[in-house]
């Protein structure tokens, strides 16, 4: 039976919000029809104006909060409403954790039709100032005023700010110093539409445990006017600075970094650690942006893997090998599989750096490489997967099921694709036992989750 749409664009309606969507927006029902409302919270009664109507849902602009949630708080950031970096600053941290747990539970129930325990979210001791890496875009507005900050929601319009409240302070210091230098010497910001202008992005990277700081200036050309002044100012105003790097991106694209990098001052990488592992992090290398929460996530993966030192582990979508190496010290042998060649090179260097002789890294498609390992006599006891937001390819899941490990540990950054993939595994001889969400990105709508599956 065709659903009757009870609203039209421009309608003013009142509804009760009963949950949060995947982007942090409030979700409610009006005469049984789903309405999304940015800025609204669960258990709130709100008055909205309908701005968009589709076949199965509508979008409303929040006009008035008739009855506020007990968990509503005043956002701490002065540009929160304009900036797209955070979605949940108007919700208490306790409320954020409960909503994220519910988001995982709802996806598993609604999409995967699964009945498994979702544990309380592992929250952060410090939900602010956690990002060890920040990329600040630079732009000039129509009146010629320099803007450096973050993009507005779903746009490439730069919201100007002096500091990001979820970033480590050193990253903010880098951004402020480069801004002062650009203003003082009238250095141009890049224009995405025309392809003109020099400075595209300003990036900072912080070694949380080492204290090392790297400043990266991403430019559209090779020459940097008054470069020596920039370096001296960064050395003076950024505590812990050990590296200044230039990345050159000449392509007229919205991809942040180019392929060419040169060191302007100091080292080509900074050091940091996760648990007992140490890492060299270059300007372009992948590293978890929340070091403190990453350790909690990896420890949970280690707990679910239940290693005694005798097991063979395969880590699919292993990236730069952080999870592989985290498990290697507790396993007999670990194989990491990753299709991105530069990531595998980084993984091999990380294994060498940490003297993990029992970690081997393979560049290739997991659906092809898993059967090869099996044909070569490798029988994994545990398989770990840490796929991108789209989840695992079905051929990879089928290959894992065919290999028949005793346990599968699934690390997910998207509850919807997690639910879909767990449902597939349940149809292929595995049972999802427990899901542990981890809050890697406080103040945002993102949630990570570690799930244990065993052979049924």
Q: Each PLM stretch: what is its role?
A:
Residues 49-53, 137-141, 205-209, 456:
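Short beta-strand micro-motifs enriched in acidic
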Residues 57, 210-214, 445:
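Conserved loop-to-beta-strand segment in the C-terminal subdomain of adenylate-forming
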Residues 43, 167, 290:
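Short, conserved phosphate/pyrophosphate- and ester-handling motifs at nucleotide-, phospho-/glycolipid
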Residues 26-31, 149-152, 216-218, 347:
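Short, acidic/hydrophobic/Gly-rich beta-strand patch recurrent on exposed beta strands
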Residues 1-75, 79, 360, 368:
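Terminal RNA-binding accessory module
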Residues 2-11, 22, 222, 226-456:
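Rossmann-like S-adenosyl-L-methionine
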Residues 202:
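Flexible loop/N-cap segments at domain edges
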Residues 63-75, 81-189, 209, 224:
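Extended interfacial segments that mediate partner engagement and assembly in macromolecular machines
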